[in-house]
Amino acid sequence: MLIINKKKFRFSDWFAEKVIKAVAFLSIAVVILIFIFVFREAFPIFKMDKKTAVSTETLVQESYGGSGTENSIIKKVDNQVDNSNIIHATNEKPSATLLSKTWMPVSDNPRFGLWPLFLGTFKVTLIALLFAAPLSILAAIYTSMFAKPRVREIIKPVIELLAGFPSVVIGFFALMVMATVFQNIFGYASRLNAFVGGVAMGLAAIPIIYTLTEDALTAVPKTFIEASLGLGASRRQTAFYVVLPAAVPGIFAAVVLGLGRIFGETMIALMATGNAAMISMNPFDSVRTLSATIGAEMAEVVFGDTHYNVLFLIGSLLFIFTFALNALAEFYFKNMVIRRYQSKK
């Protein structure tokens, strides 16, 4: 006797499946629409015609508390243009200034040089990675290989709890506490600088790097550890010469995702870096990052203005870079881990 089992139709299961699928497609559509909107607002910067910008500012002497003449300030000449007072004139597209070394968007002759912002972002990101990555990886090695279960149950939640701290809280801590402590230790002039901002951003990135690294170390097959210990290797040798190399792809993915977290951070950079757009390789000088520039200036720009379009161009660059980092970590490094473990079986 042939018995055919038919799956009973359940409206609740069908409805839940459709809702989940709709939410997934909606999420993808929202990301695509954001991507299109940001690029649409940034694109006009490349279509603007050449404009001649003339500064009518003149240098006049001003004394402070006496008749001294060693100080001078820029004073605007109202209702007249004197050719002898013209400091600069330009006849170039606004997009041509993007590769200059000056970020001066509010001026008679605005300059939108992105190099100071790129350099500031690079300095802060490098400092944050050098601070966060070693601490996170070493902490993950300790909790996965050396810590007792009770200690592991305390350390891991405490570190992961840091991920729940709002960025403004970490930024405020850096502004009020870290900046003063570091200035007293190192004796630099600028209280808020790339070093303070980098360390603060590193604190924000530690939970991400630590959690993913610990997961990668835990995912290493136990047979690797047992074989190493069985051959006479110590637990330290096993951790650093067996487990760590096997988990390298996962650790790289953790660092890359932490890099994306640092690169897109706005509030900490806005509060702790000094926000001075200048070119300097000194880590103790104030800097301005790409994301902090958007946060500081977007609320004050005129809709559709050149400055407005440049800020959206910066947002496009941030979008592309963080998207590329996340895609690299998600697809490339994860596939490396899968292939490595499958080849060992």
Annotate the PLM regions:
Residues 10-38, 42:
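N-terminal signal-anchor/first transmembrane alpha helix
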Residues 160-205:
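Generic hydrophobic transmembrane alpha-helix motif, especially the helices
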Residues 214, 218, 222, 299-345:
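C-terminal transmembrane helix and the adjacent membrane-cytosol boundary/short C-terminal tail
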